[in-house]
Amino acid sequence: MKRIFPVILIATIVLLSACSKSPEPTTLINCDGLITDTLGTGDNGRIYIPNAFSPNNDGLNEIFRPVTQNIAAIIFTIYDQNNVVIFTTSVLGYGWQPSLQASNVAKKYYYKIQATTASNKKIGLCGEFHSLTCFPVNPPRSFYYFEDMLTPNGFTGVTNESLPTCY
C-alpha cells in the first residue's frame, strides 16, 4: 500500500498538469463596461437593432441603425473586423450608410451601444451584424432580420429585400 500511494500521487499530478483550459471564444470588440440597469424596473426604454442591412442603393434597408423607443441619449459605435472604429454617433435615429458596395458581398461588422432611457436608466448592447448585397448560402436567409421587418412587437414578418444568392 505504501508503494502504491506515491505512484497514484505522481500519476494524478502528471494527468492534472497535462490538462489545459479550453480557450475562451474570441470577440473582436470589447463589450466590458456596458451597463444595463433596466431589468425589473418597469422601464419602457427599448432598442431594436437588425442583424443585417443592404447598402445596395435600392432604397430599402440602406442604413444600419438602432431603432429606439423612450431613449433620451445614445452612443452608437461600429467597428470593422480589425476592431477599428469606422462610425460613431450620439444622434438618436442616425445610422451608418457606407459607400456603395460591390455586388455579391457579405461583410461582418460589430456594434456597441450605450444608451440612457427617458427614466435615466442605462441600456448597453453589443453584437455583430452583416452588410449584404447578396444572401450567403450559409446561414440561411431566415437568419437575417432587416429594419423593414420591425413592427411594434419586434422583428416579425418577411423582409421586402430581394437580394441574389452569393456564390
Q: What are these regions, as identified by a protein language model?
A:
Residues 12-13, 68:
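Alpha-helical transmembrane segments and their juxtamembrane interfaces
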